Amino acid sequence: MDTSSINAQSIFDDNAATLKLSWLTGHEGWERGFSADTVGNATSSADLVGHLNLIHPNRIQVLGEAEIDYYQRQTDEDRSRHMAELIALEPPFLVVAGGAAAPPELVLRCTRSSTPLFTTPMSAAAVIDSLRLYMSRILAPRATLHGVFIDILGMGVLLTGDSGLGKSELGLELISRGHGLVADDAVDFVRLGPDFVEGRCPPLLQNLLEVRGLGLLDIKTIFGETAVRRKMKLKLIVQLVRRPDGEFQRLPLESQTVDVLGLPISKVTIQVAAGRNLAVLVEAAVRNTILQLRGIDTLRDFMDRQRLAMQDPDSQFPGKLV
């Protein structure tokens, strides 16, 4: 992953208001950031931000009241040694939290080494939690996929397929039926957790839907605030096909999935043909997926009925064909 854009300046700009940060000294080191090896070897954002630690280099070091109190109780020789070790680690920046006064020697060494030094009245724990969440977001795996991302019945659904199949028209029909648009054409996905992928719309395309013959439609203006969504978790991919290929199955025995950022996402394939109500079919696919997530599999239930009927032809059970 390219980490060149992640530096002290960008992190300060994004978090200054939330964390009430003040840039005390070391402005010349605004380009300081994380090395590619540091990010690659980190198992989580917790490895990149934490309390004062002289063992792990190239991480954001936060000094709270406890660390400052410990520093004040040291001898002059130990203070100088600890400060030298801290600066030698070349952290992206240091944060003195809890409203504590930055030790003069720390300020002096940060100034000489161009190490950014921030201060904040917020507690060290709050600063660390906030920065870890921030780092997990900006360093999370990302991908941009083509399609229309819709909120259908509270489930994030990505409509995909070849150009000209009517994905945008289908999206418009679903929006008119009360569902919400997240993004059209290009959808930015990011894996923020071990079990979910979140999709958003690029700022340039916010609230817009392109329909052939009509051009760009501002969905928020036409249908109202409730017709758009800022983000949704991706739960289902609906692939539109012009005609079934050799691998198309009317009753697939195994659920289809698509790998998105390392996470398997459920997929259904719907054939586009004259006279088919695609909006109703997509809604039905979503409702069926919701049932499957709750442990209800209609096809499996039918196969169980069929097996019982074959084992005991005289048995009477709901749904038996006569």
UniProtKB/Swiss-Prot annotation:
Residue numbers annotated as active site: H146, K167, D185, R250
Enzyme Commission numbers on file: 2.7.11.-, 2.7.4.-
Source species, domain of life: Bacteria
Region (Important for the catalytic mechanism of both phosphorylation and dephosphorylation): 209-218
UniProt keyword terms in alphabetical order: ATP-binding, Kinase, Magnesium, Metal-binding, Multifunctional enzyme, Nucleotide-binding, Serine/threonine-protein kinase, Transferase
Keyword Cytoplasm recorded: no
GO molecular function terms listed in the Swiss-Prot or TrEMBL record: ATP binding; magnesium ion binding; phosphorelay sensor kinase activity; protein serine/threonine kinase activity; protein serine/threonine/tyrosine kinase activity
Bilayer-spanning residue ranges: none
SUPFAM superfamilies per UniProt: HprK N-terminal domain-like (SSF75138), PEP carboxykinase-like (SSF53795)
Residues reported in the UniProt entry to bind Mg(2+): S168, E210
Annotated binding of ATP, by residue: G161, D162, S163, G164, L165, G166, K167, S168
HAMAP family for the chain: HPr_kinase (MF_01249)
Described purpose of this protein according to its UniProt entry: Catalyzes the ATP- as well as the pyrophosphate-dependent phosphorylation of a specific serine residue in HPr, a phosphocarrier protein of the phosphoenolpyruvate-dependent sugar phosphotransferase system (PTS). HprK/P also catalyzes the pyrophosphate-producing, inorganic phosphate-dependent dephosphorylation (phosphorolysis) of seryl-phosphorylated HPr (P-Ser-HPr).
Subunit structure: Homohexamer.
Domain remarks in the Swiss-Prot or TrEMBL record: The Walker A ATP-binding motif also binds Pi and PPi.
Name of the protein described by the UniProt record: HPr kinase/phosphorylase
UniProt lineage: Bacteria, Pseudomonadati, Pseudomonadota, Betaproteobacteria, Burkholderiales
